[in-house]
Amino acid sequence: MAFSIKMRASKGDKHISGAETIVMEKENIENITAGYIKRALEHELGAPDFINIKIDKINKKDIIYIDALPIKTINCKNKEDARRVAKNLLKNEGISDKLIEKSFKIIDDGGMRGAPILNLNGERLEPDKERGVRVKNISTTEELKEKILKNNIGTDRTVDAIAIASKVINLGVIAELCTSDNNSYTTGYVATKNGYFRITNLKQENENGGRVFFVKNDTNIEDLIYKLENKPYIIK
């Protein structure tokens, strides 16, 4: 058996921190959970008043292994330049200007615990509009993490995000737009079938963050949400 470890921390209704991984040996559970608790308690958004650790058994045969999306960093001098880059990447996937503007407004308004799912008509498909949808049961291999960090391809946040992005694109999501909910981290990304594009200055310091998923109009939304939340993926 393998084990899925998830951490969520909050203060009142405000999300503070979240992390998760999949471990193959139960001996690793204690160190991982201790690290997650430390991460939550020392978060820049403030000390949480609630930390939840959840550990679930997973059958190793149910885990899907996929390659990470190729990572490319696009350096932008300011938010306006960065958003123009993001917009062009999304337009290349058939997403309209109007829908892109709507997605940025959702992100900039903040406050969501998960991500909204928008079809190409601009309709929100997730059943709980306040909660959104969370991508769960994901992890990266140590080899991928080491490659990203040692080669200066990205940061620890990149390691976390590449797992989400690679899984959602593998499940048929057209694109993902994301900025961090950490106040000081201004690099965001667009993920498509063509790669994971890190974009510097996609938001300014102390602005809200969030993510949006774009899907085809004929997407089976119940099936997609089930797989996003429950199907275990390890990204290599």
Curated annotation (Swiss-Prot):
Needed co-factor(s): Mg(2+)
Catalytic function, reaction form: heptanedioate + ATP + CoA = 6-carboxyhexanoyl-CoA + AMP + diphosphate
EC numbers, comma separated: 6.2.1.14
Pathway: Metabolic intermediate metabolism; pimeloyl-CoA biosynthesis; pimeloyl-CoA from pimelate: step 1/1
Keywords attached to this entry: ATP-binding, Biotin biosynthesis, Ligase, Magnesium, Nucleotide-binding
InterPro entries: BioW
Top-level enzyme category: ligase
Pfam families with a match to the protein in the record: BioW
One GO BP: biotin biosynthetic process
GO molecular function, one term: magnesium ion binding
SUBUNIT field: Homodimer.
Entry similarity comment: Belongs to the BioW family.
NCBIfam families: bioW, PRK01322.1
General function of this protein: Catalyzes the transformation of pimelate into pimeloyl-CoA with concomitant hydrolysis of ATP to AMP.
Name of the protein: 6-carboxyhexanoate--CoA ligase
